[in-house]
Amino acid sequence: MIKNRDSFLDHVANQLGRPRQTEGVLRPNYRVSPQFEVLKDASKDELVTVLKEQCVAIHTDFKQVESGQLETALDETIDMYGAKSVIAWDDRRFHEFGLGSFLTRPSVSLWDNRDSKRSIEQAEIADVGITFSDITLAESGTVTLFSSNGKGRSVSLLPRYYIAIIPKSTLVARMTQAARHIRQLTGEGRLPSCINFISGPSNSADIEMSLVVGVHGPLKACYIVVDDK
């Protein structure tokens, strides 16, 4: 639940010299709303194609597999990056997708909220961070991560490489649909403490437009789209 909202808004209204408006406030009805038209009728398969094409533009590796092939796809990606150590979210979806044995490997660490300092240190030295995507924006090639217990931000930020597992059901057209879902969570009092939008590996460019990869995050990223269980 959202705490202290009423007292905060009362204070703002008081500083504005007027009472709070709690009734009669209507959302604007804009004459033109192109954000709702882009890819509005696209199927999940069509959104996968859009995402795959966008991954080329954002320098992100892309794979699509059935759920039974997911562990093999992870192993192939880890080998492709020459990685040895992994840190992953402590997320029930790993077990739902048959990756329970993967998590028990000596080379794999799980985020532990009971000792977040140690988890951050493990993320700093890990070669690969692996998370699931909660919402996936096909148009921009963006994975959305909701932080919560077991799902630390450092897992996708600090390792040299990043792998996002994308259940096909999480695909939406663009930010429009993601914002709608987040607004719904807000209304239900279930807004995550932190929401991260990640579009491929870390990219920076100076005034001369020289692309530098990996300054603010992973050097490489891979999206693995998987059919839902």
UniProtKB/Swiss-Prot annotation:
Functional description taken from the UniProt entry: Is involved in L-lactate degradation and allows cells to grow with lactate as the sole carbon source.
InterPro entries reported for this sequence: FTHF_cligase-like_sf, LUD_dom, LutC, NagB/RpiA_transferase-like
SUPFAM superfamilies from the UniProt entry: NagB/RpiA/CoA transferase-like
Pfam families: LUD_dom
Source organism: Shouchella clausii (strain KSM-K16)
UniProt protein name: Lactate utilization protein C
Biological process terms in GO annotation: lactate metabolic process
Family the UniProt entry places it in: Belongs to the LutC/YkgG family.
